């Protein structure tokens, strides 16, 4: 498979590959990236007649999710590790699903728990093989697992457990993103 990445963005700037620019994307991104809007991405893809478009959302942000419909309507498939993408208000979720069907596009997503165990595809595979899943239980967060296990086994103040978890790098800015 020959993957080509003509557009690379972060939350504020984008690198749009131009004729004659080599494939040193990291250097090009630092030197040539410019502020952008999602409409700029769509326009660039159309002007260059790119095929098999895929927008990859590797963020934990709501910002790109709010543009999924625009991307889908303009020929992009969506691949996301963004955990928020499937927890949208039901109206937006349904609109995305309707557009995926209408424009014959795909929305592929996965998330992992703890040390990287892929949850969604594993559950999908079990279900598709005929297994009846009746219950899923557990603490599926390395952060919360550490906090709960430590707090339940030690005579340590909860605030101290949180502080230690933060010092060890287990804390995210919000547990909802875990």
Regions found by a protein language model. Name each.
Residues 5-6, 78, 107:
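Hydrophobic/aromatic residues located in beta-strands of well-ordered beta-sheets
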Residues 61-74, 83-126:
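Rossmann-fold NAD(P)-binding glycine/threonine-rich loop
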Residues 1-74:
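N-terminal glycine-/serine-/threonine-rich beta1-alpha1-beta2 phosphate-ribose binding loop
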Residues 74-78, 142:
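Glycine-enriched alpha-helix->loop->beta-strand junction motifs that scaffold or abut catalytic
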Residues 58, 80-81:
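Glycine-rich phosphate-binding loop of nucleotide-binding enzymes
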Residues 91, 104-178:
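Core active-site phosphate/anionic-ligand binding loop and the adjoining beta-turn-alpha structural block
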Residues 51-52, 75, 104, 133:
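A general structural motif
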């Amino acid at each position: 498979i020959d993957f080509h990445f003509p557009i690379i963005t972060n939350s504020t700037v984008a690198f749009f590959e131009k004729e004659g620019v080599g494939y040193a994307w990291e250097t090009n991104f630092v030197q040539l990236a410019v502020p952008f809007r999602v409409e700029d991405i769509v326009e660039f893809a159309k002007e260059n007649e790119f095929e098999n478009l895929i927008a990859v959302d590797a963020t934990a942000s709501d910002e790109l999710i709010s543009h999924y419909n625009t991307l889908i309507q303009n020929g992009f498939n969506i691949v996301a590790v963004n955990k928020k993408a499937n927890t949208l208000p039901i109206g937006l979720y349904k609109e995305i699903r309707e557009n995926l069907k209408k424009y014959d596009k795909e929305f592929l997503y996965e998330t992992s728990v703890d040390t990287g165990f892929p949850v969604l595809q594993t559950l999908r595979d079990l279900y598709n093989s005929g297994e009846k899943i009746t219950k899923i239980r557990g603490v599926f967060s390395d952060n919360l697992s550490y906090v709960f296990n430590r707090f339940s086994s030690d005579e340590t103040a909860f605030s101290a457990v949180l502080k230690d978890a933060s010092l060890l790098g287990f804390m995210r800015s919000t547990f909802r993103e875990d």
